[in-house]
Amino acid sequence: MQADEISSIIKERIDNFELDVNVAETGKVMAFADGVAKVYGLKNVMSYEMVEFDTGDRGLASNLEESSVGVVVLGAGKNIKEGTSVKRLGKLMKVPAGDALMGRVVNGMGEPVDGKGAIETTEYRFVEEKAPGIMQRKSVHEPLQTGLKAIDALVPIGRGQRELIIGDRQTGKTTVAIDTIINQKGQDVVCIYVAIGQKESTVAQVVRKLEEHGAMEYTIIVNAPASDSAAMQFLAPYTGVTMGEYFRDNARHALIIYDDLSKHAVAYREMSLILRRPPGREAFPGDVFYLHSRLLERAAKVSDELGAGSLTALPIIETQAGDVAAYIPTNVISITDGQIFLETDLFNSGVRPAINVGLSVSRVGGAAQIKATKQVAGTLRLDLAQYRELQAFAQFASDLDESSRKQLERGQRMVEILKQPPYAPLPIERQVVVIFAGAKGYMDDISVTKITKFEAELYPFIEAKYPQIFEDIRTKKMIDKETEETLSKALEEFKTVFVA
């Protein structure tokens, strides 16, 4: 081999030489217990930055102290021990978003847990995102129908609203949420159901119900079950809302349900106490209000300049023995735009959905209600309140005057009309027709026990003989003189058939 050949080979080698060095800031675990690692080093780590242990586990830098960092481990972290090496990843947490997630079940970090393979998406978004400001928003003005008569007529929800569902355990809170998801079929609304600290079997049941009704194809489920670490339960709602924001920011509509935020607060309390943050009322940390406010403020109706998309939130809170004045319930009530209050007594007496009409309000939904519903249900709230008052009075007074007795009987029928079986949401035009029938006295002489049968037979009758009524309410979104006359005629005709 010639000398010049050798020198050219050496030159080529030098030219092609790449120094492949990875520079990463590292630290060492000083102590690890209850899913939290105390790490020495990582001087320049950011708050909530992702870090990686050499065991492969990942964590979030939560407490930034002078000489150490409190890292919340995501997952079990079984192999982490004192002396384990930790390195900064230099990035904040991101989760997948987009249409590829529909029909899937993911964990608190957005990883699939349904055995249907990887999620094919290129869209990743930051979990912690600032909520839209005042100028980026628009007031709530389009209805988001739940398919439940008691809600759509009395506590209407609009797109971009936050409406709290609150009640004791076993009062049908999740059922209201599932009904709302089922009712979004064909409405072009993407639904996200976040299960926090639930039993795996309960979540499996929810998935099965949604599949039965063909609702899973437009639904994403984020599941952080009771067996998951507190950190995963804390993360799940933020993961869910990040997925929802993708649709909101792309001029589409989404609905997110947090089931439930009581367990979310408990998971955060557990995390904070392990991180040795000072406890406050009910041992919750001082920033538990901010925990929920920064989450719920991300639900919004976005301005026309930004595409007029929306993200509607239905947080659920579980109360203890009806105590709405506890810390977390009052916090969330003050953050949301109204609440649907479910009562054990009503549930047990057969009024389902067990909505207490007196305590439930919707602070912005009225602007989103369609005119037809306003026309038939305008005085319904007041009538029901007067009925409740009369009912209490009638227990003691035996002799009631004629008008009071009529009011009582009408009230009983209205309560009966507002009852509804689970997982059977009603289209708005049917709701309008049946509430019209009740409010205008077409059911006054029908026995209370036959109201359900009356309602069940009324829809097919109108569908067969007067289909124009449903069509008009659907398209005009109001009852004009002509529709009212046709509807009155149809009800008179149906009543003679029904009574006979």
Curated annotation (Swiss-Prot):
**Origin superkingdom:** Bacteria
Tell me, what is one Gene Ontology molecular-function annotation carried by this entry? ADP binding
EC number(s) given by UniProt: 7.1.2.2
Q: Predominant location of this chain?
A: membrane
Q: Which InterPro entries match?
A: ATP_synth_asu-like_sf (IPR023366), ATP_synth_asu_C (IPR000793), ATP_synth_asu_C_sf (IPR038376), ATP_synth_F1_a_nt-bd_dom (IPR033732), ATP_synth_F1_asu (IPR005294), ATPase_a/bsu_AS (IPR020003), ATPase_F1/V1/A1_a/bsu_N (IPR004100), ATPase_F1/V1/A1_a/bsu_N_sf (IPR036121)
Membrane topology of the entry:
Peripheral membrane protein
- The kind of enzyme this is, by top-level EC class, is translocase
The record's note on quaternary structure and interaction partners says: F-type ATPases have 2 components, CF(1) - the catalytic core - and CF(0) - the membrane proton channel. CF(1) has five subunits: alpha(3), beta(3), gamma(1), delta(1), epsilon(1). CF(0) has three main subunits: a(1), b(2) and c(9-12). The alpha and beta chains form an alternating ring which encloses part of the gamma chain. CF(1) is attached to CF(0) by a central stalk formed by the gamma and epsilon chains, while a peripheral stalk is formed by the delta and b chains.
Q: NCBIfam families recorded for this chain?
A: atpA (TIGR00962), PRK13343.1 (NF009884)
**Name recorded for this polypeptide:** ATP synthase subunit alpha
> What is the native source organism of this protein?
Wolinella succinogenes (strain ATCC 29543 / DSM 1740 / CCUG 13145 / JCM 31913 / LMG 7466 / NCTC 11488 / FDC 602W)
Gene for this chain? atpA
